[in-house]
């Protein structure tokens, strides 16, 4: 479970931006809250609003880039290969480091992991945990100067195998380091998502191929969404699957006749929901942190709402899955769906071009306040200015 993520000097984010999933004292929708231990409560969903080009997607991009650097395509760079730094561009100052930090729970233990980097090397890296409720260092790194608390000699050997453009959390786990294993596994197993309009079909296809209960869950959701699809089959090769959906028509003699339609001929919204629901069910099964940019893309608002309701329902979300998403859908600004501490905003300063991230709770909205109307009227900022005036709605 993710408690907090912070990012500094990434794309439109110059100064440190923080999103927190720690639950406030809000007494509404308390049944949706999840608990990593007996003392803390977290929210399962965080929604991030903002105008186009405000920088809201850059927060999610940073979180997923952190994963890519730990265990994805940037985890095994060759010597001399450049790191994927995208620093804030609107400044005359020399390029500053970019930094990420995630505070999370895995196996009942709290961890804080972060690092800073430029285009050529990792500048700092650190990992702390709270095994008995007290903070303890696992390792820290400043350039190639390391500090360890356990298995010191062995870890110094692993540090010597860590190139300046690679993370120690990554290389130490290639050598099965027990001190960093669990912190690494959270990133590898629990952090997932996608940006923009990307359609990720791997989870849905895996469920269909497995058949049985896994396929039934996908079909149940497709039927629930009223998309007219009765079955889904996969032919072709694993590398080039051919996905078809079964539709039925009632004939004059009272029987039904089935027709298989290639998924590519379905509406974009249907294709999008199929890709989404596969990832949703996989995340709900594994208790992941699911990061989704533009959650409503091409889908009917009721389908988007249903996906969020699944995460908010404690009877469905039994493994403490979390969802972090960006959206423009003001219909989701509904206090019967989301708590006030689950709604966040991104706003860009037109003078400095910097993105500011802040929570709805900073405005202390009333319990029955119409959040959607207030947002469109500019009460919380983070909206476009059309012709020099704030967009608004009666």
State the predicted function of each range.
Residues 1-4, 247, 305-394:
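C-terminal lobe/lid and adjacent interdomain/linker elements of RecA-like ASCE P-loop ATPase modules
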Residues 45-49, 237-281, 289-302:
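Conserved ABC ATPase signature
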Residues 91-146, 359-368, 374:
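P-loop NTPase motor core
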């Amino acid at each position: 479970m993710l408690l907090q993520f912070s990012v500094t000097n990434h794309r439109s984010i110059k100064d440190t931006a923080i999103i927190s999933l720690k639950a406030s004292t809000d007494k509404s929708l308390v049944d949706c809250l999840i608990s990593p231990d007996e003392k803390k409560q977290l929210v399962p969903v965080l929604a991030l609003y903002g105008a186009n080009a405000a920088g809201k997607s850059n927060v999610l991009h940073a979180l997923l880039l952190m994963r890519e650097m730990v265990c994805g395509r940037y985890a095994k760079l060759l010597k001399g290969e450049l790191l994927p730094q995208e620093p804030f561009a609107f400044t005359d100052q020399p390029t500053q480091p970019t930094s990420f930090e995630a505070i999370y729970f895995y196996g009942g233990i709290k961890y804080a992991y972060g690092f800073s980097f430029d285009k050529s090397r990792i500048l700092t890296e650190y990992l702390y945990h709270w095994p008995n409720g007290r903070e303890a260092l696992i390792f820290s790194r400043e350039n190639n100067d390391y500090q360890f608390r356990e298995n010191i000699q062995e870890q110094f050997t692993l540090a010597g195998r860590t190139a300046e453009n690679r993370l120690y959390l990554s290389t130490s786990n290639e050598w099965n380091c027990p001190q960093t294993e669990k912190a690494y596994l959270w990133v590898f197993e629990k952090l997932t998502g996608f940006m923009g309009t990307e359609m990720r079909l791997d989870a849905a296809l895996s469920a269909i191929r497995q058949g049985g209960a896994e396929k039934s869950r996908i079909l149940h959701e497709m039927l629930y969404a009223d998309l007219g699809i009765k079955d889904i089959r996969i032919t072709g090769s694993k590398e080039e699957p051919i996905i078809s959906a079964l539709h039925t028509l009632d004939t004059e003699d009272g029987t039904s006749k089935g027709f298989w339609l290639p998924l590519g001929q379905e509406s974009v919204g249907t294709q999008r929901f199929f890709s989404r629901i596969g990832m949703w069910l996989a995340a709900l099964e594994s208790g992941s942190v699911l990061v989704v940019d533009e959650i409503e893309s091409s889908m009917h608002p009721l389908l988007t709402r249903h996906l969020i309701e699944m995460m908010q329902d404690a009877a469905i979300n039994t493994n403490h899955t979390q969802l972090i998403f960006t959206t423009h859908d003001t219909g989701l600004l509904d206090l019967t769906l989301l708590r006030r501490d689950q709604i966040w905003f991104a706003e860009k300063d037109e003078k400095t071009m910097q993105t500011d991230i802040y929570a709805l709770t900073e405005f202390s909205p009333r319990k029955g306040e119409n959040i959607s109307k207030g947002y469109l009227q500019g009460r919380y900022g983070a909206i476009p200015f059309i012709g020099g005036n704030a967009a608004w709605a009666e």
